[in-house]
Amino acid sequence: MRLPGMGKWLLPVVLALVVTGCGQPRELSEEQRTALEQRVQARWLALVDRDFGRVWEYSTPDYRRNFPKHLYIHKFSYAVKWELTGVKVLDYDARAAVASVAVRVMSEPTKFTSTASRAIGAVPVTIHEKWIFIDGEWWFSTNY
C-alpha cells in the first residue's frame, strides 16, 4: 500500500538519519585513547598498591554517589597480588560513549596454600573492563 505524499518526506528523513549516524566518530582520537589508557593504568596501579579508596575514585560519579567509599574498600581480597603488564583499548561505542578495555596482569596468591600453587606461581590474566566517557573524563563502569 502506498500512502500519498510519503515520498516527499521519507527520502529526506532517511538521508538525515544516515548523515547524522555517520557524523559521529567511530574510533577514539589518539588523545582520547591516551587519556583512557592513562586512567586505566592509574586505577590498576592503585589496585596493585591496595589503595582501594583511590580505586573508588575512578568509579562513575553516579556509582560514587550511591556507593560510599568506606563500604567499597571492603569488597577487595588481600589474598591476591597483581602486577600490571598491559592495557589495550579493544573497542569504542561512540553512541554510548563506552570503551572496552583489556587489562593484562600477573596474578599471584599472597599466601601459597599448597605445593601446586607454589609451583604454578604467578599466572597471566586478562580482565575485560568497560569505561564510560562522562563530562570530558573516563570513568570505570561497574555495571558491565
Segments from the language model and where they lie:
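Short, low-complexity N-terminal intrinsically disordered segments enriched in polar/charged residues
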Residues: 22-51, 57
